[in-house]
Amino acid sequence: WIMGHMVNAIYQIDEFVNLGANSIETDVSFDDNANPEYTYHGIPCDCGRSCLKWENYNDFLKGLRSATTPGSSKYQSKLILVVFDLKTGSLYDNQASEAGKKLAKNLLKHYWNNGNNGGRAYIVLSIPDLNHYPLIKGFTDTLKQEGHPELLEKVGYDFSGNDAVGDVAKAYKKAGVSGHVWQSDGITNCLLRGLTRVKEAVANRDSGNGYINKVYYWTVDKRATTRDALDAGVDGVMTNYPDVIADVMNEAAYKNKVRLATYEDSPWVTFKK
């Protein structure tokens, strides 16, 4: 999965997919009542990027729906996965469950079209704080209450705080999650970060009894870092330059080893070599 980083304006969906991304990451900010409000990152953000692009969250969902609904004039068949980077740092811990409920209602209405031929992309809810694990239950309970438990088949989870792998496992246990787990590791492109924790996450994924299904590394903009990440066995790389990742994947060392994921590749099934 080549994951386009910080895709917060609707026009950027096409821009990143056309550069080679089959997945995008979108920031979601919340208002004081835990309603998802804008797709907005704000300052500071990655070096070389504008941090201030935004849409109203519901408008973005509608744009995303057209980009991922077969038959729509805006349809991009390659776009198969969307990571919502949930900026829950602005919320009190006791609002996490409420944020999950509201997120579920927004997605159900504006993205899934109330279960009636909505967008088809898989969704990863990425949460920065382990204490906000109740967001997951708020989300899953709401989809069930609204009569659409089948949509949970399209939803996965990520804790993005670079916490110890064991602590992340405990948070999932509390949230009642087993499966559909992506594990992120990384840092802004302005700084360097080694691959120690990525390798630990990959080992957990491949152990047969770990909690992780997929591992992605962020933010990867350089060819050398891309090669290191692919060598470490990641499933996804998040990048500001999808074309750079695509180029590296076409190099002799990689072109027979890795390929771009398609809609038929489940993002929840651990790849067995």
Curated annotation (Swiss-Prot):
EC number(s) given by UniProt: 4.6.1.-
Functional summary from the UniProt entry: Dermonecrotic toxins cleave the phosphodiester linkage between the phosphate and headgroup of certain phospholipids (sphingolipid and lysolipid substrates), forming an alcohol (often choline) and a cyclic phosphate. This toxin acts on sphingomyelin (SM). It may also act on ceramide phosphoethanolamine (CPE), lysophosphatidylcholine (LPC) and lysophosphatidylethanolamine (LPE), but not on lysophosphatidylserine (LPS), and lysophosphatidylglycerol (LPG). It acts by transphosphatidylation, releasing exclusively cyclic phosphate products as second products.
UniProt superkingdom: Eukaryota
Disulphide bridges, residue numbers: 45-51, 47-190
Protein residues bound to Mg(2+): 25, 27, 85
Family, as annotated: Belongs to the arthropod phospholipase D family. Class II subfamily.
Tissue: Expressed by the venom gland.
Keyword Metal-binding part of the UniProt annotation: yes
Class of this enzyme: lyase
Keyword Hydrolase: no
Catalysed conversion reaction: an N-(acyl)-sphingosylphosphocholine = an N-(acyl)-sphingosyl-1,3-cyclic phosphate + choline; an N-(acyl)-sphingosylphosphoethanolamine = an N-(acyl)-sphingosyl-1,3-cyclic phosphate + ethanolamine; a 1-acyl-sn-glycero-3-phosphocholine = a 1-acyl-sn-glycero-2,3-cyclic phosphate + choline; a 1-acyl-sn-glycero-3-phosphoethanolamine = a 1-acyl-sn-glycero-2,3-cyclic phosphate + ethanolamine
UniProt organism field: Loxosceles hirsuta
Main localization (coarse): secreted
Lineage per the UniProt record: Eukaryota, Metazoa, Ecdysozoa, Arthropoda, Chelicerata
Cofactor note: Binds 1 Mg(2+) ion per subunit.
Protein name: Dermonecrotic toxin LhSicTox-alphaIA2av
GO cellular component: extracellular region
Residues that span the membrane, as ranges: none
Essential cofactor(s): Mg(2+)
Compartment(s): Secreted
Pfam families, alphabetized: GDPD_2
A GO term, aspect molecular function: phosphoric diester hydrolase activity
